[in-house]
């Protein structure tokens, strides 16, 4: 049996409790592919899993965390992939129901593995490609769900997050007006570099300071009612994140709070090859470079990456490039 390095989560724990272990490399099976991990991004859902979700019954402990990766097929099994194919993989139970990307190798279901189009390698570095899968799929899906056009005014709540910066890049390419929020004026310059036309300090209560017809709510239930109060008539609010740390909301009255307004959400659990191709094509066509906050190169640094995510100071995607 071949041994590999991985982070194995056995129960809820602190970031510093995550340690590199040596475990057996997974054995290939029908409809799954063995992938050599080139790199992966760190996601807030992985921090939440480690912090308090690991004890939920749908989590198959012990598990290797990690909901996304970029890698190379080393054993294609009976699938349509070929050895050597460069792929992205994301979601579908990755890092929860089955072992994910915090490892040197991962055995992944064919349905959640997608070829990276050749055009991507002509436009993006490997680090930039690693920053794409989950964050750009989420941002692209959210922008599409909002039916964003160049005539719209988009308010991005939680704009300094990786998804917020990404969404602004995509929205800027579409040509709409972008209003971005941050807890500090120190981040306004960066927000403007990523497409913001106007920046607002957000203390959780914007009190109708600004009205918009489209809102991307990344903070979640903590500010959702306030965001709905900022929507123009027939406006749309898409709830995609829970940066505020609160997952559920009390006091919501749909008749009152959604009067002549619309609320929707985007859930990134159902990627397809078609959408992955669309995302990379959009990036190339509009000369968009992913926003990277920090690059690590060793699994030993996973605790540092989780702490950086918890600090909300990354200001871009936290990624690992292992090879």
Regions found by a protein language model. Name each.
Residues 24-41, 53-94, 100:
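Glycine-rich beta-strand-centered segment in the early N-terminal region that forms part
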Residues 80-82, 148, 231:
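Short, well-ordered loop/turn sites that connect or cap secondary structure elements
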Residues 86, 153, 235-236:
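Short glycine-centered segments of the SAM/dcSAM-binding site in methyltransferase folds
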Residues 90-158:
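NAD(P)H dinucleotide-binding glycine-rich loop of Rossmann-like/cofactor-binding domains
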Residues 130-204:
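Mid-domain Rossmann-like dinucleotide-binding core that forms the NAD(H)/NADP(H) cofactor-binding site
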Residues 207-215:
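A short acidic, Gly/Pro-enriched loop at the edge of an enzyme's catalytic core
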């Amino acid at each position: 049996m071949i041994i590999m390095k991985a982070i194995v989560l056995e129960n809820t724990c602190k970031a510093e409790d995550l340690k590199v272990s040596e475990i057996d490399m997974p054995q290939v099976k029908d409809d799954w592919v063995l992938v050599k991990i080139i790199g992966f991004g760190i996601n807030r859902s992985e921090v939440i899993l480690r912090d308090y979700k690991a004890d939920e019954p749908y989590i198959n402990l012990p598990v290797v965390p990690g909901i996304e990766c970029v890698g190379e097929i080393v054993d294609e099994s009976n699938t349509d992939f070929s050895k050597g194919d460069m792929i992205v993989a994301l979601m579908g139970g990755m890092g929860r129901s089955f072992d994910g990307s915090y490892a040197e190798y991962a055995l992944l279901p064919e349905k959640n593995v997608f070829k990276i189009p050749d055009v991507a390698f002509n436009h993006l570095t490997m680090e930039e490609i690693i920053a794409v899968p989950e964050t750009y799929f989420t941002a692209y899906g959210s922008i599409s769900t909002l039916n964003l056009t160049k005539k719209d005014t988009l308010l991005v709540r939680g704009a300094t997050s990786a998804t917020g910066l990404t969404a602004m890049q995509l929205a800027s390419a579409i040509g709409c007006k972008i209003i971005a929020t941050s807890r500090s004026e120190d981040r306004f310059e960066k927000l403007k570099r990523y497409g913001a036309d106007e920046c607002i300090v957000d203390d959780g209560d914007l009190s109708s300071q600004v009205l918009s017809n489209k809102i991307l709510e990344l903070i979640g239930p903590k500010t959702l009612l306030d965001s709905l109060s900022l929507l123009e008539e027939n406006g749309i609010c898409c709830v995609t994140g829970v940066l505020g740390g609160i997952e559920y909301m009390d006091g919501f009255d749909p008749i009152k709070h959604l009067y002549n307004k619309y609320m929707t959400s985007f859930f990134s659990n159902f990627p397809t090859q078609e959408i992955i191709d669309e995302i990379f094509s959009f990036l190339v066509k509009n000369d968009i470079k992913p926003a990277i906050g920090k690059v690590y190169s060793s699994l030993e640094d996973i605790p540092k990456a989780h702490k950086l995510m918890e600090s909300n100071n990354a200001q871009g995607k936290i990624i690992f490039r292992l090879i």
